[in-house]
Amino acid sequence: MASKMCEPLVIGRVIGEVVDYFCPSVKMSVVYNNNKHVYNGHEFFPSSVTSKPRVEVHGGDLRSFFTLIMIDPDVPGPSDPYLREHLHWIVTDIPGTTDCSFGREVVGYEMPRPNIGIHRFVFLLFKQKKRQTISSAPVSRDQFSSRKFSEENELGSPVAAVFFNCQRETAARRR
């Protein structure tokens, strides 16, 4: 069953380009505007993801803590992502079986603003070894590395991940 859960992440090149292969062990749900659920590979326009989503962790218990990272691995464009990855959000110390509003926001939410092509926006959930594992915010949102961040903070592999696609909304044509 775990390989079935990973399949969209492999096809979407999240596993490989963003993180190494892992088996999801916790269920995570991401919902924008109370009714727009994020499913792997689904498309959203920037106008529908302006506010931070509700992210629920369905696993562990109140003594388990999680770190959520949201990144864009396709900056500035998917054909030449030389600024990979762009950090959009970090929330730490999220108790298991709750949502991210119970955690500590280390880096505030930044809405997706893809300029060139279709970008993937990836939510990664890591289980912390203990509370307050993350000591400080990254210096820059640009050229962030999920792998390096996980390693530096001893987070290990993700326990859950989901991504959506997003592209610039077409401007109204003038006549």
Swiss-Prot record:
GO terms for cellular component: cytoplasm; nucleus. InterPro entries: PEBP, PEBP-like_sf, PEBP_euk, Phosphatidylethanolamine-bd_CS. It is found in: Cytoplasm. Changing P76L: In SP mutation. The keyword Membrane does not apply. GO terms for biological process: negative regulation of flower development; vegetative to reproductive phase transition of meristem. CDD domains: PEBP_euk. It comes from the Eukaryota. Belongs to the phosphatidylethanolamine-binding protein family. Not known. In plants homozygous for the recessive allele of the SP gene, sympodial segments develop progressively fewer nodes until the shoot is terminated by two consecutive. inflorescences. This is Protein SELF-PRUNING.
